[in-house]
Amino acid sequence: MAALIAGVVVAPTLTISTVTAAGELGAGGEYHPLTPARIFDSRPTSSINDVAPLGPKNQGPSDPTFDLQLLGLGGVPNSSSDVLAVSVSITVVHPTSIGYLSAYPTGAPGTSSLLNFAAGQTIPNLAIVRGGTGGKLTIAINGSKVGKADVLVDVLGWFSSSTYNAGTPGDLADERGARLVVVDPARIVDTRNGGGMPFPLGPGAQRTVQFRGASAAGTTIPNDPSVVGALINLTAVEPTADTFMAVVPDQPVGEPATSNLNISAGRVQANLVMVPVGADGAIHIYNSAGNTNFLVDVMAYLQTGADVESRKGRVIPLTSPYRSLDTRQVAWGGVPLGPAQAEDWSFAAFAGSVNIAGVAVGNQLALLGNLTNAGTARQSPNVSAEPGFLTVFPADAAAVPNISNLNTYELVPVPNMALIKYSAANQTVRVFNATGYAHYILDVSAVVLAD
């Protein structure tokens, strides 16, 4: 590995609302996993919720937008005073030209990207989104040409506010959700080389992955009913046909109504997934078409029963996504990361700037953000860049972990939401690039509190 470059991310003061100060958090920042449900589908063949103008949405250089109601759908409460943020999977379907999609609270500025896509490409990404004016989310489909694109939105769960009050009055155990337990990332399934499941997943088939009690590379998930959700990075590896994959808590009967990963034949692609754990302690992975190998990298689990006075594991969304890294810009060095190289970034200044009504939220152990490889460049002008990957992990790790956050291709932007754990010192992360020369971008959506 080449010498590491230390950098500091300096962020302006960030503001957050809805969550009160320490000691009064209650259910604030706790997660309530839901069985995945599709709450929006603009395709003409779908009868699921759409908004005017009906059908494929406008795409173009004028940043066309539409607004989507987040509250009261798919199991999310209807009251904005109860809901801090919502976890969704957003998919752009067959856009007519190259572009990118942004998602942000209605009424807030949209200055970041969630999805980058080529003409005709169907691609999803996970997002932690806050409702804006009227509890709505604004989606913008940007492109260099005027065109159209369909959009799908699947709700995965929601984060409660400190004022959330449901169930038995005064019974916090009944009102509260789950905390995010961030682990050292580890690969628990790799169908290519054994990995507990030594064969590809076939068409219309599902595979049961035992999550409670899973163990790999020193990371172990408790085998306990209090583990109610999983945060995993699912990677499909070279399917033999264009396909989609879905992760659900219960063994599917037929084709699931939601999707987590859409991928073209022969490609390698990842997507971060938040999913409830089923009563059997497992999650179930479905493949629609062809045969595909797949990887499951565990990033965290969701566990109930935390002390109400503790802060650890609460997820606090930012007012809107914040661009914390963009190595294309001089402010972050303007130099791509080379092959088999890594570099460090300290998020101490960023973490110190996150506040609620002017009061710092305190110690943080991780962030959730959209990581984008802006397109890998060649090592030699006459030799194509090999497909590769980016891995982001705590800078104090002894070695690069055997996981990946996203897979890279020459000159093709690739996004994926990432849970990034900080090192114990200076809240520093390390970015490793496998092949070619890579510029990358990180738009932060939320932070994870520590005690």
Please report, for each region that a protein language model flagged, where it lies by residue.
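Short edge beta-strands and adjacent beta->alpha junctions
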Residues: A2, G7, A11-D451
